[in-house]
Amino acid sequence: MNNFLESKMRQSGEKWIKGIQKLLTPKRLAALLTVVYVISLMPLLWIAKYNYPSADDYTNGSRCHQIWEMGGSVFRVMGEALLRTVDEWFTWRGCYTSSFLSALPPNIWGDNLYFLTPWLVLLMLSGSMLYLLHEILVKAMKADQYTSHSISMLVLLITVQCLYEQGRVEAFYWYSGAINYTFVYGLSLLFYGLLISAGYAKGKKRTVRLIMASVLGFLTAGGNQMTMLNTAIVLLVMIGIMTYRKKWQEHLGLLLPIGTFFVGFVLAVIAPGNFVRAGAAQGMNPIKAILVSLYGCLDLAVDEWTSWPLIVMVIAMVPLFWHIAEKSDFTFRYPVVVVLFGYGLVSAMLTPPLFALGNMEAGRIQAMLFFMYVLVLTLCVGYITGWAQKKYHPCSEINEKAGIWCLLGCFAFLLFGSLITVIPEPHYYSATSAMTDLLNGSAGVYGAEQRGRTELYHDRSNDMVEVDDFSEKPSLLFFSDITADENDWTNKGVARFYDLETVVIKKDE
């Protein structure tokens, strides 16, 4: 009797699994995860209508804004941004791409356009990640496009939604932080993707990709120092591998974008402004910065970055990577080397802020580190999974069943865990944080108070403006504010932007 019942239960379970297999095809899984990701972005983009500039947005964009207000053309504004870039290269920093982009916050064209900041940054982050992973998984590893897309969606969900609260405003909503770090990070991903694409393309397609990669390489080299250093390390390792394997004859054209990047790299490093800025900061010596980076990477990975949703979603990627490895002729022979390189690459990203500033506390820096950690962790897990598949070769039928159970278990646990997490911690995910501030009204109140301030700034009847402090400061939108001191640099920046004499917050009576 027991054997009969066990047999029936086994048959019923097998039928259920086969039904799930037919339902959960790679194409449908990719579509489902895409819908989930797009839905998760909606609150982040909706709350953007209450987003307003602060701090460096005013100081960096004031001159371009004044030219535009005086009836200047777009070309004159761009020319002013270029002049500012040259001036900063001599007097403040060598990151020419960041200097140029920083001079063009959306509010220089109109205060009501600042909502575009998260749209622009999230589009760049999403598009560049999709493109890079497609080139790695589909072009290099011969994966099917649907499995590759599913992995990309999981990576983006982790990257955007699991970023901890302190980094979100600077990574997505504050233009001066988002454009210099998240956007430039996206440029580097596009650069990597174009290098891979050019390596596999032929004829005119290769020429076009090499030219595009050369432009992006130069722009990436002029971005923030964290991205610049990481890209240089990746390219040097690539040069070493291609030289060792004698691949230059068939990929000689790659020297153009690589060379263009290093021309920009040298241009950014030798800038006189770097030495001026270094004199105003107290950073660590190079050896200490490297050692602290190696420790800091491990410390952050354990204490900050590796949340339970990240672990669950990475586990969900394992059967997808296994499926890719089954059909790939890639050998995955060096898992230890790849993991160590990944650890070194993420650690290296900590070194520039430690060397230049002596700390890495800024939210935008923390966000960049998290983005890189998620990408490197994903690729390392994929490589180790591929190595295990090639080494042990379990039968494909068991693989498929185990993969289905793994995916279902991960998604069920993620859904249940998220429900019981966001109730006591509504700001746990980026999307739920946005929904919380939208539903409780704090975002709307903040937006209304910002609009009231803007009206006062544009009122030419008084050049000495006093404004009330904000009654609400939504966690996703509020970065910093002016003070009661008219000589504070943030106050001066706002006053200069709107051509006022002074701007202050009213002192408490």
Q: Where in the sequence are the language-model features?
A:
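Transmembrane catalytic cores of multi-pass membrane glycosyltransferases
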Residues: 43-120, 175, 221-365
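Membrane-interfacial entry segments at the cytosolic side of transmembrane helices
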Residues: 205-209, 245-259, 330-337, 393-412
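Hydrophobic membrane-spanning alpha-helices of multi-pass integral membrane proteins
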Residues: 260-262, 337-350, 372-379, 408-417
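Intrinsically disordered, polar/acidic, low-complexity terminal segments
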Residues: 18-92, 106-150, 392-509
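Membrane-interface micro-motifs in multi-pass membrane enzymes
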Residues: 56, 147-196, 224, 348-382
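Short, Lys/Arg-rich, polar N-terminal cytosolic tail immediately upstream
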Residues: 1-23
